[in-house]
């Protein structure tokens, strides 16, 4: 059993991401019909030795934790459908058909990446008998990384990619967090994630926690200490509501940013929140909580608490189960409701 200690309390990287997008972002409509405040190419780094980085300024336990772990285990499985996953959580139901099939599934690409049946002249491709090839003629990227960490840990080719351009061009929802790279420094294993699109209120906290678990799982099996998790988000955004509510931010974003620039202490975010709720039009029936700005301002007003610890059982990756991943000493603030923009 490997444990991530709970030594740190700082969630400054995520807090800085929120305030950066609020302070420098642009109002931006998008395909969902729910507008955003969007920033370009945002980055943060978290030291995983300071504890498991599950946010404490809102509650991510209970059904949220259940969904997070079962989703990650689904990735590990390599399944292209959600028939097993939907027995535990419905977070992918909106993008699947009645039989549970998806246009794109992360784990399918992690564990079963398509390999061309016929390559062009001069190209190098593994044959069907290669150790990382599956029986169906696909490539197991995760097995490749684990074996390479054992045999050549200083490799700079420890890349896992969930993006297939031809699939993404026609997929209902191509991968958001689409490629990640492991990197060894001394006896520490680090992980860098690149994400094309990141919902700061809902998605990014899940991504941070899930990839921190992934880093711990891989480090444990490869014999390394945990290092850092780094995250680059190309379009980092905060959803700000649909209809009149979303459009209001297009006309008043400068004023919001001016008020945020004057904040001197966490509790002053509540003053900005009160002004916003008084000034902005109410969200329409059926569109409640699509505006994530008030909830994030409430979250920003809260002092972070000590990070929890995470235990992961030392079992083969293929046997890893929900019960093998245990969160300890988690004492978060109350939950905050954010609606999902689909």
Swiss-Prot record:
Biological source species: Haloferax volcanii (Halobacterium volcanii)
Keyword Nucleus set for record: no
Domain of life assignment: Archaea
Primary localization class, coarse: cytoplasm
A Pfam family hit: Thymidylat_synt
Entry GO MF terms: thymidylate synthase activity
Binding site for (6R)-5,10-methylene-5,6,7,8-tetrahydrofolate: 199, 341
Keyword Cytoplasm: yes
EC number: 2.1.1.45
Pathway: Pyrimidine metabolism; dTTP biosynthesis
Catalytic activity as recorded in UniProt: dUMP + (6R)-5,10-methylene-5,6,7,8-tetrahydrofolate = 7,8-dihydrofolate + dTMP
Subcellular location: Cytoplasm
Protein name: Thymidylate synthase
Role according to the record: Catalyzes the reductive methylation of 2'-deoxyuridine-5'-monophosphate (dUMP) to 2'-deoxythymidine-5'-monophosphate (dTMP) while utilizing 5,10-methylenetetrahydrofolate (mTHF) as the methyl donor and reductant in the reaction, yielding dihydrofolate (DHF) as a by-product. This enzymatic reaction provides an intracellular de novo source of dTMP, an essential precursor for DNA biosynthesis.
Any one annotated GO CC term: cytosol
Keywords carried by this UniProt record: Cytoplasm, Methyltransferase, Nucleotide biosynthesis, Transferase
């Amino acid at each position: 059993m490997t444990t991530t200690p709970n030594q740190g309390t700082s969630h400054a990287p995520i807090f800085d991401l929120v305030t950066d997008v609020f302070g420098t972002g642009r109002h931006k409509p998008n395909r969902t019909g729910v507008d955003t405040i969007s920033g370009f190419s945002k980055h943060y780094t978290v030291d995983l030795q300071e504890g498991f980085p599950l946010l404490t300024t809102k509650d991510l336990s209970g059904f949220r934790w259940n969904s997070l772990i079962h989703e990650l285990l689904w990735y590990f499985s390599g399944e292209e459908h959600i028939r097993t996953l939907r027995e535990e959580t419905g977070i992918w139901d909106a993008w699947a058909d009645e039989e549970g099939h998806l246009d794109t599934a992360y784990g399918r690409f992690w564990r079963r990446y398509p390999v061309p049946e016929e390559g062009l002249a001069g190209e190098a491709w593994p044959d069907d008998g290669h150790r990382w090839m599956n029986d169906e003629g696909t490539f197991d990227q995760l097995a490749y990384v684990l074996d390479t960490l054992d045999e050549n840990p200083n490799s700079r080719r420890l890349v896992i990619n969930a993006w297939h351009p031809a699939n993404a061009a026609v997929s209902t929802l191509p991968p958001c967090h689409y490629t990640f790279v492991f990197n060894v420094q001394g006896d520490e294993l680090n992980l860098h994630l690149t994400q094309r699109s990141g919902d700061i209120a809902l998605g990014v906290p899940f991504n941070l926690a899930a990839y921190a678990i992934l880093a711990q799982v891989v480090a444990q099996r490869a014999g390394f200490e945990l290092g850092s998790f780094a995250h680059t988000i190309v379009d980092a955004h905060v959803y700000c509501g649909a209809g009149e509510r979303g459009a209001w931010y297009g006309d008043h974003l400068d004023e919001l940013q001016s008020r945020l620039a004057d904040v001197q202490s966490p509790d002053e975010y509540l003053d900005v929140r009160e002004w916003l709720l008084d000034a902005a039009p109410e969200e329409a029936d059926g569109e409640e909580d699509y505006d994530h700005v008030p909830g994030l301002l409430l979250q920003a007003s809260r002092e972070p608490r000590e990070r929890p610890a995470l235990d992961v059982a030392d079992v083969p990756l293929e046997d890893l189960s929900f019960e093998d991943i245990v969160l300890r000493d988690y004492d978060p603030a109350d939950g905050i409701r954010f609606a999902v923009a689909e």
